[in-house]
C-alpha cells in the first residue's frame, strides 16, 4: 500500500493506486491466487503482524474452522516508514546492531509465509512436516504508542502465555529468535524479559536477532523470522547475531550472562523447540513456539464451555454518541449526516484527559471514546488484577489509511526529511487499539484485523474464539472507520459514493459513505454473573468464508456469504427455521445488495423473515456499520426497542420497507461483507 500511496500523491491520482492502498488488498490477492474459500483477513499489528497471523491460523485449525491456512506477512520499502522513523531519529546511520550498539534500526523489506495445517490433513496428503505449532501468547503493554514498557511486563506476559499454552516449561526452549530491533529501549526491555524468564531455568538457551542480517521488515518481520526459527530447528543451526567487533564481545558477555547470543557466526546445536518473539508499535507483543517432532508435547489450549454474552455497548455514530442517543434517534425515526464527531463532553464523560486525547488522530479518538463507553456501559472496571484477563480485537476497513495518506502527501511536498514525529505513530493500523489499551489499562489479547466492512463483525467472531480458548474472560470487539476528507476523496475517485442520501435496496450504482465506532463488550456468562452484570443477549455462533472475486468488487461472491451463514448456523447448533430476523448489510448499491439477497434467499423466505438494516439511518459506515449491526441486534433482543422496528420484506422482485414487532424476536443473524468476497455471519440469541 505504501508504494501505491507514493505513486498516487507524487505522480497522479490514479484510481487503480487507491485500490492497492488498503492492507486488505494483500490477503485478498493471495486468497484469489490460491483459491482460499475459508477465513480471509489481514492482521494489522505492525511489526507483530506476521507472528500473530501464524498464531491465528493455528487457532482456527484447532477450533475446527479450517484444515489449511496460508499465514504470513509482507511489507515493501516505502517513503512513509522511512520518513517516519527518520523523524523519530530511530534509524542507524550504519547497519543496525541489535543487542550491541543499539543505535537504531535499519529498514528492510520482504515477505514470509508458512502453510499451517492440521496434522491429520497433512498426513493424509503425504505432506512434508517441518514442525508443530504448539502455542502462542499475545498481550498489550497499555503504556506508550511507540516505546515498550521498560520493565518488560507486556513482553513477559506474551512469552509466558506462549510457554503455558504450549504445555512446556522454560527449559524446553532451545532457541529464541528475538525481536532485536537495534534500538536502545527495545533491546534493553528484551534483555530484561529474557533474563527474567530464563535465568536459572535454562542454562543452554541460544538467542539471536536475524534483523542484523535482514534489517527490520516491519509487517513482514514476524513471518520472516518464524521461517528463520523453523529452519534453525530443522537444520540444528542457530543463526548468528552479526555485527560484533572484538571489543564488543566482552560487553556482550557481561550483558548476556548465560544466554548465548551467537555472535557473528552460526552455531551447530540440537534444537527441538524454538520461540519466535515480535513486539510492535501500540505496545503489542506476540510470542509463538514451534516443536520439531509433532506430538512430543501437548498443546495446552483449553476450550471453555458455557455462553458468551454481550454486557456493554459503546457507540459513536453520526446520529450521536452513546446508546441513549442512538435509541432516541431510532424512536424518532431520525437520519443523520455522514460524519461522526467526538469532543470535550465525550472525553470528560469517559475520563479521557486532554494530555492524552490531543495526541490521537481522529480515528483513534473515535475508538477511544466508544471503547471506554462500552466498559462504562457494561460496568466493567479494569484493575491491575484483571487487566490481563480482558483483551480487544479492533476491526477496521480502512484503518490508518487516512493518516498514512496525509503523511505521504506531506512528505511528497516537503521531502522525506519533512516527516512529522507527532503524526507518524498514527500511520500504523493498530494505533487505535494501542491508544485504547493505554487509556483503558487493558493488557490482554490485542489484535487489529482489517478486511473491508466485515472487519467490524469479524472482530466479534475472533473475540469469541479468544474467549472460547480460555485466554481471556472478557473481550472488547470493535468496528471503527472514519469519513475524513482523504477517505471520502479516495472513494469518490473510485466512483463508489455519492453525496446524496442513498437507502438500502434502491438499486443505485453508489452508496452514502459515513463512519463511526462501535465497541461491544463480550464475556463469559460466568464472568458476567460473578460481577453482577446484566447481559443484553448471548452470542452463540459465528462463521467466516470467502468467494474470491476481483478486489474492489463483490459481484458473483454470494456463495461466500452462504458458506459463512451455514458455518454460523452449525456453530450455534441451530437451523434457518429458528432465525427470526436478519440484520443485513445492504447499502443501496445494487451490486452489494444483490449478493446479500441472493445468499439470504437460499436459507430464508424473505417474504416472511425480515431484513433489518442499520444503514437506513447511518449510511455505509463500513466496519462501524458491521459492529453496529450486532449492537442493534443486542438492543432489540434486550427489549430496549419493544415496539415495532423498521425492516424490509421481499415483495416480488423488490425489497420493500415495512415494520416488524421487535418484541417477538428471539434469534437474530447478523451478516456483513467485504470487497473481494469475504463474509462474516454471527448469531445472537435472547
Task: Tell me the role of every PLM-derived stretch.
Residues 65-103, 136-150, 178-188, 202-259, ...:
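Acyl-CoA/ACP chain-elongation machinery
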Residues 166-172, 198-203, 255-311, 383-387, ...:
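Flexible, low-complexity linker/loop segments at domain and module junctions
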Residues 12-14, 25, 52-55, 59, ...:
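Glycine-/small-residue-rich "gating" segment that lines the acyl/pantetheine channel
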Residues 24-27, 53, 117-119, 151-167, ...:
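Short, well-ordered amphipathic alpha-helical segments that serve as non-catalytic structural scaffolds
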